[in-house]
Amino acid sequence: MSRVAKAPVAIPAGVEVTLNEQTITVKGTKGSLTRVINADVSVVVENNEIKCSSVEGVKTNAQAGTARALINNMVVGVTAGFEKKLQLIGVGYRAKIAGKGVDLTLGFSHPLVHELPDGVTAVCPSQTEIVLSGTDKQLVGQVAAEIRGYRPPEPYKGKGVRYADEQVRRKEAKKK
């Protein structure tokens, strides 16, 4: 069995877990998440713990570890939630919340409007910062990557949209 799958997922107080064949639903204070688990993985809920194990074979051990990590992210998401912080570095780069989306000015001839999916909320503490939050870790990360993809940080001046904890590798300008 995978080393990750050996550790059970603890169910904190206030979280309700429902298992229906291969579908697991986790409900908490921040909302509810549902996911279909691979058929090669058996999931058991007992004693306020969720245990994942592979049905048979070496190839399914990795699936058991993946299922355990996904279930753990669901439990953390409905209790604490996830957030990603983005910084806009560059002259005239701004962001503001516009209805159900984020209005971005990133040096193009037109402003960009990125529509936010259900389950993700955005806050702009300043014009050059965006904080995305939600219960689904994958969805929050995907939206952050899409916004970063409009203008990734460039290596010469460091301008662009970057994650708050991202270190941009800088290059030296060409010398004559």
Curated annotation (Swiss-Prot):
Matching InterPro entries: Ribosomal_uL6-like, Ribosomal_uL6-like_a/b-dom_sf, Ribosomal_uL6_a/b-dom, Ribosomal_uL6_bac-type, Ribosomal_uL6_CS
GO process annotations (BP): cytoplasmic translation
Record keyword rRNA-binding present: yes
Subunit structure: Part of the 50S ribosomal subunit.
Family that this chain belongs to: Belongs to the universal ribosomal protein uL6 family.
General function of this protein: This protein binds to the 23S rRNA, and is important in its secondary structure. It is located near the subunit interface in the base of the L7/L12 stalk, and near the tRNA binding site of the peptidyltransferase center.
Name under which the protein is recorded: Large ribosomal subunit protein uL6
Organism expressing this protein natively: Shewanella sediminis (strain HAW-EB3)
Lineage, highest ranks first: Bacteria, Pseudomonadati, Pseudomonadota, Gammaproteobacteria, Alteromonadales
